[in-house]
Structures are given as structure tokens and as C-alpha cells.
């Protein structure tokens, strides 16, 4: 059975658990999976890279949450997380890479997007053929 890597952040653990549960529920029908936790969104791509160099995965899904605060930290973290995940996708183009890092202004927006985005993004990974698959 082909294997998918689920890389998630440790921030907002209750919401991340929902995201991971949705991803696993969809993926386990077709794939085995490994789940690993990064300290935060900025470390997601580096952790994934360390794992995919050593193992064969057909896909990666990144589950994370960044909520805007009162400083520019949100902009720095969200931009760098997206840039590094995009760079990883370019460098490992034989693996399906799905970015499900949800960047929102507040918790109300998170509630609106959490389940829908995770289901939609995981389904993309589920249905995307990978050259490694």
C-alpha cells in the first residue's frame, strides 16, 4: 500500500486533531500514512523534507493553522510557511504536495474553514495520481 505523510503543527491542538482525523478518515481507504508533528507552521516543510528523503511517500498533506495577532508575526509566518511548502513541491515534483495550512484573521474564520478546507484538500490528495503511486 502506498504511503502518505501527514505533517501538522502543534498549535491549536483541538483544531489540528479535527484536521488530522478528517485527513486520516479519507486517506486510510487507499493509503497507509505516517503522522508527524512540527513545532509550528514555519517548520513544516523542513520536517517533511527530512522524512521524504529517507522514505517513499506518494504524497504529503500539511495541516496547520495560523491566526493573525496584533503584530507582523502572522505575515512572516504565513508567507514563509507557504513559500517553503511551495519550494518543497518544486524540488520533489514526483510527490503530491497539498498545503492545508489555514491562515485566518480570527477563530470565527477558522471555524468556517476548518472542516471544509481539510476535506477538500485531502480529497485532492486522495484523487491526485503521483508518479510514485
Residue ranges and their predicted role:
Residues 92-109:
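Mobile beta-alpha loop/short-helix "lid" or hinge segments that flank ligand
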Residues 126-133:
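Conserved small/polar residues in nucleotide/adenosyl-binding loops
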Amino acid at each position: 500500500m502506498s504511503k502518505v505523510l501527514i505533517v501538522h503543527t502543534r498549535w491549536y491542538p483541538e483544531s489540528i486533531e479535527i484536521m488530522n482525523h478528517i485527513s486520516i478518515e479519507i486517506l486510510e481507504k487507499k493509503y497507509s500514512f505516517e503522522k508527524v508533528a512540527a513545532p509550528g507552521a514555519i517548520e513544516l516543510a523542513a520536517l517533511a523534507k527530512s522524512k521524504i528523503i529517507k522514505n517513499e511517500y506518494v504524497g504529503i498533506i500539511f495541516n496547520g493553522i495560523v491566526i493573525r495577532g496584533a503584530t507582523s508575526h502572522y505575515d512572516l509566518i504565513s508567507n514563509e510557511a507557504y513559500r517553503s511548502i511551495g519550494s518543497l513541491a518544486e524540488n520533489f515534483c514526483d510527490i503530491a504536495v497539498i498545503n492545508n495550512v489555514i491562515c485566518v484573521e480570527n477563530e470565527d474564520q477558522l471555524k468556517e474553514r476548518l472542516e471544509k478546507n481539510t476535506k477538500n484538500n485531502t480529497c485532492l490528495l486522495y484523487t491526485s495520481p503521483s508518479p510514485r503511486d
